[in-house]
């Protein structure tokens, strides 16, 4: 798994990353970016994390596609916070001419009456790849939710 990830990161000369036992963590390139992590949970089970959002995959190819997409400007993370505490993360992808929702992860917030603040985080580390094949594979299972 690490070899395949390093092949992707070779195309990202500005990427700062750390290797762990079974994971690779790419740091946000700017204060407006988000961390991207790919982790092998066990054989044929992978998790990809963007900030507070995550998804499990049972194919390395799909996990690598999601990991790579998070490094591009065709993906953004919508982060909702209350009193400076993030509680909902939505992954959106660019489907010209609109941003489309892929999926959302959330935690409970006891700050019920606090106003919600939305921020959009985006990376631009892997700009010159053809993202359409990745989008087709990653979005197809979620079409009913889009």
Q: How should each PLM-predicted stretch be described?
A:
Residues 46-50, 91:
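Short, hydrophobic/proline-enriched secondary-structure or compact coil segments at domain edges
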Residues 2, 60-63, 131:
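Short amphipathic alpha-helical segments that mediate assembly, nucleic-acid/protein binding
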Residues 1-13:
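Amphipathic alpha-helical segments
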Residues 72-146:
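Acidic, proline/glycine-rich low-complexity IDRs
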Residues 49-59:
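A short, exposed loop/beta-hairpin motif centered on an aromatic-Gly-Thr core
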């Amino acid at each position: 798994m690490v070899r395949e990830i390093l092949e992707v990161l070779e195309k990202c000369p500005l990427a700062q990353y750390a290797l762990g036992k079974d994971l690779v963590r790419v740091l946000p390139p700017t204060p407006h970016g988000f961390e991207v992590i790919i982790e092998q949970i066990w054989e044929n089970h992978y998790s990809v994390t963007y900030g507070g959002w995550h998804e499990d995959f049972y194919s390395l190819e799909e996990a690598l596609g999601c990991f790579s997409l998070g490094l591009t400007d065709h993906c953004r993370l919508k982060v909702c916070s209350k009193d400076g505490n993030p509680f909902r993360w939505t992954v959106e992808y660019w489907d010209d001419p609109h941003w489309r929702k892929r999926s959302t992860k959330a935690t409970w917030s006891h700050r019920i009456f606090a106003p919600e603040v939305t921020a959009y985080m985006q990376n631009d580390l892997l700009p010159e790849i053809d993202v359409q094949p990745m989008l087709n594979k990653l979005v197809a299972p979620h079409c009913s939710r889009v």
